[in-house]
């Protein structure tokens, strides 16, 4: 793990640059490209972004981190508490005066790590609070659902933590964007490490979160490990937010597997 070093300043720089680049120039509408026809085009001196994150549910810890990062990015965009970071960017597009001269305001929603709740909160932020862009989320199921809504409403969706191949693959939308890597990339990147650390003669057992990310994560890791020569003993789906995984232990122990692969995230990963 020591080979991969991330520092706080570098992460913040990347986050602010990405957020500004995505938020600033994009105003799209279903079936139209004229800027003055954009959905929720701001007419005053502020522009509103919608931060749709899990504030409850099994991925709430990740949502809290996301929201803190978004709030910090807004301060940077508005030139509040920047600490001189913007001046270190090679691009000078960010001036600390908001987006295109408009001060950035934000509203928030709780996805609850549920697709229906996430759509409802995104719709409220768009229709009632004038959000010009929706971003956030820690579940690929949520990401797919919300980007579908944003497609219908002509609003940009910048996905948060979505790792499923399908977000910008099978379920891609014109108004949906991602900065996060996907499950395929994880599988390809892990291959050489797994071979070096564990060899090519292993028997793997998968416990997998039962939704789009878990499915594509399992598939991608299986493709990699089987390509190394590993045998896949079993793949077992588990509900998101299961909490207690003790019922799954005995089958794993009796399977003959010597590697357990947990395709889990958030509190489910901690518990499993």
Indicate residue ranges for each PLM-predicted region:
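Signal peptide-proximal N-terminal region
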Residues: 68-105
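Extracellular/periplasmic bilobed ligand-binding domains
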Residues: 150, 218-272
């Amino acid at each position: 793990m020591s080979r991969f070093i991330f520092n706080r300043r570098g992460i913040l720089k990347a986050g602010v640059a990405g957020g500004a680049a995505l938020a600033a120039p994009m105003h799209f509408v279903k079936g139209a490209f004229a800027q003055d026809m954009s959905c929720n085009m701001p007419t005053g001196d502020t522009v509103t972004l919608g931060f749709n994150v899990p504030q409850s549910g099994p991925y709430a810890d990740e949502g809290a981190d996301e929201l803190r990062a978004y709030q910090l990015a807004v301060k940077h965009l508005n030139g509040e508490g920047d600490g001189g970071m913007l001046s270190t960017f090679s691009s000078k597009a960010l001036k600390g005066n908001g987006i295109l001269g408009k001060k950035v305001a934000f509203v928030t929603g709780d996805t609850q790590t549920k697709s229906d709740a996430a759509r409802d909160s995104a719709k409220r932020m768009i229709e009632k609070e004038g959000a010009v862009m929706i971003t956030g989320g820690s579940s690929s199921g949520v990401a797919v659902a919300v980007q579908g809504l944003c497609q219908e409403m002509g609003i940009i969706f910048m996905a948060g933590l979505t790792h499923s191949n399908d977000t910008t693959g099978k379920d891609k939308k014109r108004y949906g964007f991602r900065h996060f890597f996907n499950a395929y990339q994880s599988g390809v990147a892990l291959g050489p490490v797994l071979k070096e650390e564990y060899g090519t003669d292993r028997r793997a057992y998968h416990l997998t979160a039962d939704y789009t990310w878990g499915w594509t994560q399992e598939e991608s890791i299986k493709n990699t490990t089987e390509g190394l020569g590993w045998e896949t003993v079993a793949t077992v789906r588990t509900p998101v937010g299961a909490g207690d995984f003790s019922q799954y232990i005995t089958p794993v122990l009796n399977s003959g597997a010597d590697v357990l692969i947990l395709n889990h995230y958030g509190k489910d990963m901690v518990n499993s």
